[in-house]
Amino acid sequence: GDVSGQVTKETTKLTKNKDVVKNYTYDSNGNKSTFSIKAGEDTKLSLSYEYDGSSRLISVKDSEGNQAVSYAYDTEGSLSERQAANGLKTTYGYDYQNRLTSMTNETGKGVVSKYSSTYLKNGQKAEEVSTVMDKNGKSTKKTAAYTYDMLGRITRETKTGREDISYTYDANNNRKQMTIGNKTTAYQYNKNDELLRTDTLHTDTEKNDVVIYKNDKNGNQLATVNRSEIPAEAKDTSYIDVDVTLGDNQLNDNVVNHYNALNQLTETLTKNYKVSFTYDAEGLRTGKTVNGKKTVFIWDGNQLVMELSESGI
């Protein structure tokens, strides 16, 4: 670190013979002025940063001095414009409470997409409208509207091109039912409000899809078991305690999760996949291995900036 205690260099083990090294420098105000990533001898990323008098980021440049992205702000200090090197400009609009109400993406050829949102008096989102233009200038508009109950819980979603979704809740504010068209999913919980089971009944076919959830003592989800042969009216809790056996033909949709002492997901097992995860001291996920193939996640603070696969390391 430097004299002010800011991190100037961070090293992460990639492979047995190769490290990832992140280097930082800072200006007199403590703002990050440069950031670089090296994997072994290979420089993967090198950026420099500029700020305005209020220490707001206004420019990011690459190692050649070319502008990668620039930012502008409104009188309230909110981001009003983002200009990318590829020519895409994004403008942002806000209401009197500084909530995002509009976003427009455009290139030199015109608007490519736009988004708007409105809010209820209590701050909950009432409606969203998105419009996307294709290369011929034809626009596709989609809307989403939301309805809430007196406790602020969402009770209905209405979206363009899909069936409405409605929700009900139990006395503990857990979701009790979700209905999409002719398909209703009911949820069961234990006394700690942890999800135990879902029953999805297709009213047109009377088919009942069941997912059973197994949790550890900390409330982490250890496993999900898919069972379609359980009748909808079955209340036998022995179904909930069903053993999970990977590879069992009856239970081939199982998912089994393992956690460490910090309740971080460290391993997920399915019939076809074995996925493991690693974390740093801040709790950020630093690595993922899928069936033996490793991917390393590179962070700048809390922002993921790069993923390096085994082949790219």
What are these regions (language model features)?
Residues 7, 32, 57, 190-197:
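Surface-exposed loop/turn segments flanking beta-strands in extracellular/periplasmic regions
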Residues 30-32, 213-230, 247-248, 252-264:
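Extracellular repeat-rich scaffold modules on cell surfaces
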Residues 44, 77, 89-92, 96-105, ...:
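Short secondary-structure transition motifs
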